[in-house]
Amino acid sequence: MTMKRYIIGMMVLLLGLSVSAQTTYTKADSLTVCRLLKEAPAKASTLWFARQFHGVPYVAHTLEVNDREQLVVNTRQLDCTTLVETVTALTLCVKQEKRQWTDYLQALRILRYRQGVLNGYTSRLHYFTDWILDKQQMGLVEEIQRPNPPFTALQHINVNFMSQHPGSYKALKANPSLVKEIRQQEKALTGKTFRYIPKLAVKNTQLMRQTVKDGDIIAITCKKKGLEIAHLGFAVWQKDGLHLLNASQLHHKVVTEPMPLRQYLQKHSTHTGIRVIRIK
């Protein structure tokens, strides 16, 4: 019995070491994650975790720090995507009663890569629609597309931005052969349709409050050529309506936007509305 426990303990240790060996992080990152997992209430909400990152600087391209793809953990600098991934990973850890550093690494890897398998740059889910579909298939999230109204609009996916602008991506610029696989992924997404809430329907109504919940992931749809999602954040209901908690390029940090989301969307002519994703 003692030997069996020893073997199991060694397997867990080796698994943890294996995950850590393929990971880029600082001591500050691991301390932050471990502290949050320790301090989080038993039923900590998504917003509880999201609010812990208020004030963290907005920095883009934090995942592009290695020549070879590794799992990058950076809680000190966030963009809209890494904020959503970080908070979702923490939320899932607590939901599953897993509060160790290696649990978080596993959760983040499962979220960031196709079917949770890190296998080079193209295994990362670059288009958020791809992320939604993959994580929905894994039973981690659910995209809300009903009722109608407010989900009155239909988004027709037509993505090719990455394959058309490889020079804008460090890995594609350094490895042009990867563009072919990215293009295949784009073709697999193109033609799919999803219901969304048009921006004029994002109002402070009882129907909207019943449909969109605090902590839902908000994916802002857009009409920019080659892209389908412009920005990400979390839903926060306040007295004057729905707000967005996000890593803001404008504010240079993670904030809950002072203006309601309806007004925020109106200020951006390329924004068309919102898709809503709920963590299970």
What positions do the PLM features span?
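Acidic/His-rich structured neighborhood in mature extracellular/periplasmic domains
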Residues: 58-195, 213, 237, 241, ...
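Active-site-proximal helix-loop elements at catalytic-domain edges
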Residues: 31-41
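Short alpha-helix capping/helix-loop boundary micro-motifs
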Residues: 197-208, 222
